[in-house]
Amino acid sequence: KYISPINEPNGEWSQNPNQEGSFATKADIYKVVYELDKAITNASIPTKIIIPEIGNMKYLFEADSIPKMPDNLIEDLFTRQGEYCVTKFKNLYQCIAAHDYWTTYPPKLLVEMRTKIRNAIKNIPLIKFWASEYCILEQNEEITMPPSPTRSINLGLYVARIIHHDLTIANASAW
């Protein structure tokens, strides 16, 4: 039903052969969606395209020091003012997909980032937000401790807090 052709376009994947991802500029993302939309239409396949599957939610808004790094993706891909607006493609599922990595701690950052997402998409007609990938990669005092039943409970509560905030603050329609 869905296809996600680009994974974590903000990552410089040539530096780590043990990870998968597909670095892509906003122009690359637009071209992929354009070509895939055309192919899906021509083949009459009942499939929707999901993008951008960004690996860090900050790139939905912020710029980075790397010039080609895709940033400000909500405005540039999902609003009519955006140079690479993809909302016109009929096979695009109208959602912004993002991964939760590196935006979960401290709790203040968790809340701030999800509030930014909610505020950014509330005035874009029909656009939803999906929290589309997460596993614990961070190391912080809430979850870093020797293996024990307490650690297992803390890890579960940590992930539950992320899910809760994605659903209730960012209004994620999928997790």
Protein language model features and the residues they cover:
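Substrate-binding and catalytic surfaces of secreted/luminal carbohydrate-active proteins
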Residues: Q19-W175
